[in-house]
Amino acid sequence: MSNIEKQVGELQEKLIAVNRVSKTVKGGRIMSFTALTVVGDGNGRVGFGYGKAREVPAAIQKAMEKARRNMINVALNEGTLQHPVKGVHTGSRVFMQPASEGTGIIAGGAMRAVLEVAGVRNVLSKAYGSTNPINVVRATIDALANMKSPEMVAAKRGKTVDEILG
């Protein structure tokens, strides 16, 4: 499991995993490679991509392109989360909660990469169930997408932010 990082313009790109896969055909096995990447602007935008090709660089390039096309906005609160959130994808479950300044990113493997490129600086998190990188990344992005800022909740309920926060 490698973790390569690049800066392109204002986007941070991270390579989470490269995997060799094979397809068995009559004449033998056809080898190819898959790559899982995440990109983010470090300020609340994050996306992931999964690419597959006969060569590693081509797989990584495809994954990066897909990640750039597949970005979501995340409502951050001064470098941490708005509230505790849960995310699920197939067998992976993730739980993340806001942390005070100076805590850092307490997260493992694939989840850490997603949180870093999203711009989260302080968070406590835990992955339960399957720790397959693809499923963990999807669950993490699901959790971040489900996070709502007080402004979003207030607008939805037709109230002011002060009424929501108490």
Curated annotation (Swiss-Prot):
Gene Ontology cellular-component annotations: cytosolic small ribosomal subunit
Annotated keywords: Ribonucleoprotein, Ribosomal protein, RNA-binding, rRNA-binding
One Pfam family here: Ribosomal_S5
GO biological process: translation
Domain note: The N-terminal domain interacts with the head of the 30S subunit; the C-terminal domain interacts with the body and contacts protein S4. The interaction surface between S4 and S5 is involved in control of translational fidelity.
Entry function: With S4 and S12 plays an important role in translational accuracy. Located at the back of the 30S subunit body where it stabilizes the conformation of the head with respect to the body.
Annotated protein name in UniProt: Small ribosomal subunit protein uS5
